[in-house]
Amino acid sequence: MIRHLLLVLFLLVSVLPSTARERSLSEIRQAACSVLQGQSNRVQVQEDALQIALQKEMLTVVTHHGCFAVIANDDAFDAVVGYAEGAFSMENSSLVWFLNTVNESMADDIKKGNGHRTSIVPDASKFKSSIAPLLTTTWNQKEPYYNFCPVADNSTPYPTGCLATALSQIMKYHSYPTHGIGEKQYSFRPSEGVGEILYANFGETTYEWSKMLNDYKKDQYSDEEANAVATIMLHCGVAVEMNYTPTGSGAYSSEALYGLIHFFGYNQNIGLVHREYYSLEQWMNLVYTELNAARPIYYAGYDASQGGHAFVIDGYNATGLVHVNWGWGPNGGNGYYDITLLNPRGYQFSEGQNMLLGIDLPTTEVEYESHIVSDYPLSVSQIGKMLSVSVGETIWNLNGNAWEGELAVVLEGEGQTYLLSKGTVSKTAYQYNVLSKTNPAIGGVLTLPTGIADGEYRLYVGAKCSLDKRWQLVRRSEEQVNSYQVTIADGAVKDVVADTDDTWESTTTAIKAVITKGTNAPSRYFDLQGREVNGSTKGLIIRRQGDEVKKVLVK
């Protein structure tokens, strides 16, 4: 029942002073009053009726009649960090992880004197202004969801695990598959008590999606309905070899990726992406792109004290707050939160954040992208007419599974793609160094291709396997140099400029193949992904006429 919030939230995101200032308790209450009033049509929210549920250094949780708001204590940040219907509870470990991580990251931002930070609003030229929550389920980890999970010494089943709950809700959204693929067993060894073999026959099981309720209220469901949801919960646990414990069960995102594809038959091109190798803008673009394709996102975070946390992002509002289904039931804090605060500039709280993109049916077209990264910046310098390229000491495979393909030093521009240096990568395990499997080695002092046209180019290290349609940027840690802009004049290098931007995309996918000699050649137009479009297409497009390539802004 979250309504009428857009105007309220836009008013809250007003122009703030250039210097950070702590909000007074009255200002915090006023901000909370405004946002909570937008959530409740039952009663008029009175400021003096608000309750302070939690106060931390950088944020305050304010509650009122079964709703709560998270307000930033310092006006260096937008007032509203999050808001939700449902009672606030510190038992929700994923929500607690979010609050603790945001609190620490905001404090570090203030300590470093960073300026005013705002959430990243979806670009109206690319995305819908808002998307209502995609999930209708409000499942949790207890009864009846855990009915088929292994039993602890006290005869109570272990919790399903936040990962299994997240995956199960996403699969319920798709109501797929009817039957799984194959079977699996693994040895479960609890920290206390006797271990056991856990088994699931995915291929012989019929998943009764129509019998799974959006919410299971005590004494309001049948055994058949309970068994339907308990089955998918257990099977998700077996698929990822869940480590069940009485206080919370866990597994890895890479295992979730493998299980979705190999045991449940989901799209082969699901991608695992890691926050620390994306700029904040590009990370949010990934989120908005996925949700505009009507695909809920599996999202995971990690902290040293409590381990991993998995939940579902399934919508967003006009101010850039995403809707989170925490997997803690209808009163588990599901609502809108500012995930951009999880990673302050230059401070790696993002290490441990990842998400799965492209969770969809196998018949849906999802473009595959290799995820190969480095913790070292790219280094390029000019040596006369040549380029000296250092690709970094290590380059890691973070695809979530084994990878083989090619690495190359790519020079791209003027409608052409040149490979200045290329090596073949033999099969490399997940989280292993692909450079050690690359032959020949790439980089060093490199010469320009003969006859290269003068103009502006981008040089980067690219990765490509048999599934990629284009060279994929080997991503560097956020704010590290990942490419260079290279100016070519008279067939020689004139200038090289380092670039940390990662929002650009290859423009030569289709353009390269349509070169026509002669100045009277007809014009052809392409979008920034290299797909041919009509010349009247609005936005930034690329025009090729003969050998001439220009970017054109059509209004």
Indicate where each model-derived feature is located.
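Sec-dependent N-terminal signal peptides
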Residues: 4-14
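Cys-His-centered catalytic/binding microenvironment captured across papain-like cysteine peptidases
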Residues: 22-55, 69-70, 75-138, 292, ...
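Active-site-adjacent structural segments surrounding the nucleophilic cysteine of cysteine proteases
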Residues: 77-249
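C-terminal outer-membrane/trafficking sorting elements
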Residues: 16, 508-555
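Active-site-adjacent substructure of cysteine-protease-like catalytic cores
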Residues: 43-65, 258, 262-325, 333
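Short beta-strand elements
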Residues: 467-507
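Short, aromatic- and glycine-rich surface loops/edge beta-strands on solvent-exposed regions
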Residues: 454-467, 482, 540-545
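Residue-level detector of functionally pivotal "anchor" positions at catalytic/ligand-binding pockets or at interdomain
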Residues: 350-373, 505-529
